[in-house]
Swiss-Prot record:
It is found in: Cytoplasm. Disulfide bonds: none annotated. InterPro entries: ScpB_csome_segregation, WH-like_DNA-bd_sf, WH_DNA-bd_sf. One of its GO terms (cellular component) is cytoplasm. The keyword Cell cycle applies. Homodimer. Homodimerization may be required to stabilize the binding of ScpA to the Smc head domains. Component of a cohesin-like complex composed of ScpA, ScpB and the Smc homodimer, in which ScpA and ScpB bind to the head domain of Smc. The presence of the three proteins is required for the association of the complex with DNA. It comes from the Bacteria. It comes from Lactococcus lactis subsp. lactis (strain IL1403). Its main location: cytoplasm. This is Segregation and condensation protein B. The keyword Cell cycle applies. The lineage of its organism: Bacteria, Bacillati, Bacillota, Bacilli, Lactobacillales. The gene is scpB. PANTHER family: SEGREGATION AND CONDENSATION PROTEIN B (PTHR34298:SF2). Gene3D superfamilies: Winged helix-like DNA-binding domain superfamily/Winged helix DNA-binding domain.
Amino acid sequence: MNKTASCELLLFVSGEAGLTLAELSALTEMSKQACQQQIDYLKEKYHSDEESALTIIETAGKYRMATKEEFAEILKNYAKTPLNQSLSKSALEVLSIIAYKQPLTRLEIDHLRGVNSSGVLSTLRAFDLVEKVGQVEAPGRPSLYATTDFFLDYIGINHLDELPEIDESRFIAEEQTLFNESEENENQ
């Protein structure tokens, strides 16, 4: 079995966790010195190959495959684009709230939704649809959230003024009807 390919395979499948020289040595049944030679060879091979986007890096004593720095912008764009991933209903709900009422704090979002929105906000920030835009001058200095320019691109508009109008009075009336029905059912 090819020693170089074995090291390359193991670095590939280890992903972001990476492998120490000792782990690589144990898995390939090669000496640490032989593994180091294979890693050095692969580093040079990737470095000199302009057709390859890969490199091998060492972080905290672990080796792992990574992409070359010059491809960072492409990866950043890929990470921003949901592609085959779709936003959950709760993420769409929070995104809508922020789009129409921005800027606002997580607590304001939680109050409107009736549930904690921390996880959803993290997801929306990871997709670069929402960002922190400041802090409220109040105890705890809570962060204010607003949509990003990427959000506008994502939904295909140029400015927030292009968002469809919503009739809040209709939603309030519907909520009141549901609340009244719930009370009537409890009293029966």
